[in-house]
Amino acid sequence: MEQILDVESLKKLTPEQQKTLISGVKQQAAILTAQNMITDXSERCLTKCITXPGSALSXTERQCLQRCMDRFMETYXLASQXLQNRVXEEIAAXTRMT
């Protein structure tokens, strides 16, 4: 979907095409959100753990980075699971309504 659709074009889509388009947009938004979260966490961990410039990481810096990223990934996995559960509940609720 490289081209941008105008409102009139969107109105002409079938309900199935609209669902497909919305699903694709949601998927792209989720990917972008995940990328931004990973970038943010990486920057935070680097800022927290790397205290002085050098040609190599010290053992303390490596451990700090590992722990920081582990905590981030654990938190991210929990948040993602909760979001997936919520989306599934909303889909199930919408399905029951139709």
Swiss-Prot record:
Pfam families: zf-Tim10_DDP. One of its GO terms (biological process) is protein transport. One of its GO terms (cellular component) is mitochondrial inner membrane. Gene3D superfamilies: Mitochondrial import inner membrane translocase subunit tim13 like domains. Disulfide bonds join C45-C68, C49-C64. GO terms for molecular function: metal ion binding. Coiled coil: none annotated. It comes from the Eukaryota. Belongs to the small Tim family. The twin CX3C motif contains 4 conserved Cys residues that form 2 disulfide bonds in the mitochondrial intermembrane space. However, during the transit of TIM13 from cytoplasm into mitochondrion, the Cys residues probably coordinate zinc, thereby preventing folding and allowing its transfer across mitochondrial outer membrane. This is Mitochondrial import inner membrane translocase subunit Tim13.
